[in-house]
Amino acid sequence: MDVDTAFLNSTMDEPIYVKQPPGFVNERNPDYVWELYGGMYGLKQAPLLWNEHINNTLKKIGFCRHEGEHGLYFRSTSDGPIYIAVYVDDLLVAAPSPKIYDRVKQELTKLYSMKDLGKVDKFLGLNIHQSSNGDITLSLQDYIAKAASESEINTFKLTQTPLCNSKPLFETTSPHLKDITPYQSIVGQLLFCANTGRPDISYPVSLLSRFLREPRAIHLESARRVLRYLYTTRSMCLKYRSGSQLALTVYCDASHGAIHDLPHSTGGYVTLLAGAPVTWSSKKLKGVIPVPSTEAEYITASETVMEI
């Protein structure tokens, strides 16, 4: 659901004055100014004011804000929980039945002017599909295709693995890039994919992110390879199966540093729910230099437990 002119629903927290806009100038008092009553697009505090407004509104109708994810709200009913995910002026509503969804929709439309955009098929860059049996799949197929087009990579060259072992990223013979913007742009797109719906590239992207300040030609070539891999496998998705046991399954592991990356270690974890990952990470262990590999394993396990 989309809230119409969302920012205008909030009220200003301090006096803000604007010039009279063309076509609305008071001829008798052309030097007068207007005082803004509601938040307006373009004001630095407008997003915060709207967020506070929608937060208070949802709490008034019985929703609780998730302590860890402030954009997620939930309310318990006898038929099951209702969830509302808020992203600026877009609300994603999940209810246990169409009847309860219609009831929540009526509550919200009494408070805001809103448009029901129908069953969700895309949200925050994710392609979302819900089958007739309740299975939900998430993919980044459209986002990846757009990123590949913008980066002008060779999409006809199929790539089945994200990195090439024969091209070490830590070699110093490769020349520095004169313009680092293309590299930073591609890595930014890869980071979005790695953090959103493609856990399989978490390690390669974490590795490439270490060279954002002074990338070399080998790094740009490797980043393009990861993007080609994403394009080749763009139909891959996360599938959450209806009726699966809602129990977390967690895996974590650590390496004791690659030969070119010693003495640091890389730690990673993945959390599965309903048959697919819900959280994951791969990053260099900072601040400590584990002596035995066992120490790296314990550090990674500790960070995994803290995430859960």
Swiss-Prot record:
InterPro entries: DNA/RNA_pol_sf, RVT_2. It comes from the Eukaryota. Keywords: Transposable element. Transmembrane segments: none annotated. The keyword Acyltransferase does not apply. Pfam families: RVT_2. GO terms for cellular component: intracellular membrane-bounded organelle. PANTHER family: GAG-POL-RELATED RETROTRANSPOSON (PTHR11439), PEPTIDE SYNTHASE GLIP-LIKE, PUTATIVE (AFU_ORTHOLOGUE AFUA_3G12920)-RELATED (PTHR11439:SF483). This is Putative transposon Ty5-1 protein YCL074W. It comes from Saccharomyces cerevisiae (strain ATCC 204508 / S288c).
